[in-house]
Every structure is written in C-alpha cells, then in structure tokens.
C-alpha cells in the first residue's frame, strides 16, 4: 500500500513540476514565497502579507493587479516595474516601488537575462483576498 501511495505522489509531483516548466517560447516563471501574514486589529477586515519574489534570468510577470497597497523592496539583482499610466522604472538593491489598490501592473520583469533578481513585497489587503488578480490584455 505504501508503495502505491508513494508512486501516486511521485506521479502527481512530476506532473505538477512538468506543468510549471516554461516552454521554449516562454520566460521562466517567478517563484513566490509567503513569509508571514498578520491580521490588523486596528484596521478591521485588513491584513498584511509579506512575500519574496524571485525572478530567474529573463523572467517576467503577466499583466495583473493586487487590489492592495503593495510596497516592493529590491534585495538583489535588478527589476523593471511599471503600472498603467506610470513610467517604467529600473530598480536595484535598496530601491523601492509602490503599487496602489487601483493600479494595473503592466510591467514586472527581471532586467537581466543572465542574473536572478529577488525582492520582498509587503501587501496591505482585504483579509482573504487573492494576492494577484490577472488582468486581460
């Protein structure tokens, strides 16, 4: 029974990993790691979520929104960010970027095709709301 269970788990994991692999025409996907979340008693219905995002070389995000206040702090590498109606900016370690709840994030990518980039994001959002909402192009 344990062998069958192990085989099923292995097959599921392999399928999941294969589904996440970019094709030859796609940029590699970003890796998002939740660090912590905290309810804010002084702000009923709100929570703070802190995540790290790692962009492999050449990685980029699809157009999206957060429906949250998002505060970005670059840890390593260089990233390019832009919200709809805003100016495209290149950020390096120690620099910050802000997205408001109504902003549509039209550019988010690693500035390098050879080096990874990593940043931390603090999101002030409605409790239980999704972190990212896709926006049709």
Language model feature labels by segment:
Residues 40-45, 54-56, 85-102:
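Short acidic-glycine-tyrosine-enriched beta hairpin
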Residues 45-50, 69, 86, 102, ...:
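Extracytoplasmic
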Residues 66-85, 93-95:
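Glycine- and acidic-residue-biased ligand/ion/polar-headgroup-sensing regions
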Residues 42-45, 65, 73, 90, ...:
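Extracellular/periplasmic catalytic domains that process cell-envelope and extracellular macromolecules
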Residues 44-47, 52-57, 61-65, 71:
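Short, surface-exposed binding/anchoring microloops in extracellular/periplasmic proteins
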Residues 2-6, 11, 15-49, 82, ...:
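A short, N-terminal "cap"/entry segment at the start of jelly-roll beta-barrel domains
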Residues 88, 103-129:
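Ligand-binding loop in jelly-roll beta-barrel domains
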Residues 60-62, 80, 97, 101-110, ...:
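Histidine-centered metal-chelating micro-motifs
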């Amino acid at each position: 029974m344990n062998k069958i269970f192990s085989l099923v788990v292995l097959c599921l994991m392999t399928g999941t990993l294969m589904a996440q692999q970019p094709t030859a025409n796609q940029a590699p996907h970003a890796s998002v790691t939740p660090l912590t979340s905290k309810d804010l008693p002084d702000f009923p219905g709100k929570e703070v979520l802190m995540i790290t995002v790692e962009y492999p070389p050449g990685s980029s995000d699809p157009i999206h929104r957060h429906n949250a206040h998002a505060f970005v702090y670059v840890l390593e590498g260089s990233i390019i960010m832009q919200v709809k109606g805003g100016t495209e900016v290149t950020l390096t370690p120690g620099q910050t970027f802000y997205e408001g709840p109504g902003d549509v994030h039209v550019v988010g990518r690693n500035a390098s095709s050879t080096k990874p980039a990593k940043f931390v994001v603090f999101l002030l959002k409605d409790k239980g709301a999704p972190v990212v909402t896709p926006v049709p192009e």
